[in-house]
Amino acid sequence: MSGRGKQGGKARAKAKSRSSRAGLQFPVGRVHRLLRKGNYAERVGAGAPVYLAAVLEYLTAEILELAGNAARDNKKTRIIPRHLQLAIRNDEELNKLLGKVTIAQGGVLPNIQAVLLPKKTDSHKAKAK
């Protein structure tokens, strides 16, 4: 009985997400939806969400790498906002990118002005002799 349904056709291939096609962890489909709903442009090309998801993934990985190093330096196994703050503010490019951003519970960078430090004198050496 030809012409009745899809009995003779090929089995449909397993669905593959656009993120996995691009080799990304960030959701390309969600980024595409947000670009469309955000009224940034009338139309959104197919490559734009892939590129944007890749950029966001790269920036996230970079920040997490530096924050992980900051956590390890402080002998901690969990990244907290303080580690994110230290990572971003100690990196010149990330600090410029996120210069106006306030990180809650981030604290400040340790910094003592040179004028306030005690003066280095030879008084200790003179008293020893």
Swiss-Prot record:
The modification N6-acetyllysine is found at residues 6, 10. The modification Phosphoserine is found at residue 2. Residues 1-22 are annotated as: Disordered. GO terms for cellular component: nucleosome; nucleus. The modification N5-methylglutamine is found at residue 105. The modification N-acetylserine is found at residue 2. It is found in: Nucleus; Chromosome. There is a cross-link at residues 14, 16, 120 (Glycyl lysine isopeptide (Lys-Gly) (interchain with G-Cter in ubiquitin)). Coiled coil: none annotated. The modification N6-(2-hydroxyisobutyryl)lysine is found at residues 6, 10, 37, 75-76, 96, 119. GO terms for biological process: heterochromatin formation. The modification N6-lactoyllysine is found at residue 10. Pfam families: Histone, Histone_H2A_C. Signal peptide: none annotated. The modification N6-glutaryllysine is found at residues 96, 100, 119-120. Belongs to the histone H2A family. PANTHER family: HISTONE H2A (PTHR23430). The nucleosome is a histone octamer containing two molecules each of H2A, H2B, H3 and H4 assembled in one H3-H4 heterotetramer and two H2A-H2B heterodimers. The octamer wraps approximately 147 bp of DNA. This is Histone H2A-IV.
